[in-house]
């Protein structure tokens, strides 16, 4: 299983099937907590559809900022949801996961991605650095 954790969207692909998931990188939680709504299922499209239609006690969190994890616990919940959703056909099988990470992230940030994926139910996690956008860091 390959995962591209994006600031806006997360893509998941499976060997032989291609991209099987393309959902917003957003999680709906009870305001002031990290409690993910709907038993941990208020993630991706479900969370995005809740925006603007829910009481003020619910907030949407984008757990990645500038390509890195800004909220470890929420990223773990998001990864867990996406892995469960894609792997649902084979719940007893823990997938090997390859995750694309920005080339400039620190060792601490890499460890956070690894731990999030491991806790989300992956058997083995591999990180692959993605090339940096050449426009990144250019002054305007």
PLM regions: where:
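Nucleotide/phosphate-binding catalytic cleft detector across ATP-hydrolyzing
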Residues: 1-140
């Amino acid at each position: 299983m390959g995962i591209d954790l994006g600031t806006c969207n997360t893509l998941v692909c499976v060997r032989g099937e291609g991209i099987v998931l393309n959902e917003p990188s957003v999680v709906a939680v009870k305001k002031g907590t990290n409690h993910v709504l709907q038993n941990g299922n208020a993630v991706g499209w479900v969370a995005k559809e809740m925006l603007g239609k829910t009481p003020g006690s619910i907030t949407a969190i984008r757990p990645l900022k500038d390509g890195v994890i800004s909220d470890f616990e929420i990223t773990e919940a998001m990864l867990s949801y996406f892995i469960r959703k894609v792997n649902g056909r084979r719940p007893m099988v823990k997938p090997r996961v390859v995750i694309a990470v920005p080339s400039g992230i620190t060792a601490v940030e890499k460890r956070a991605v690894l731990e999030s994926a491991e806790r989300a139910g992956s058997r083995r996690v591999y990180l692959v650095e993605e090339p940096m956008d050449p426009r990144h860091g250019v002054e305007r």
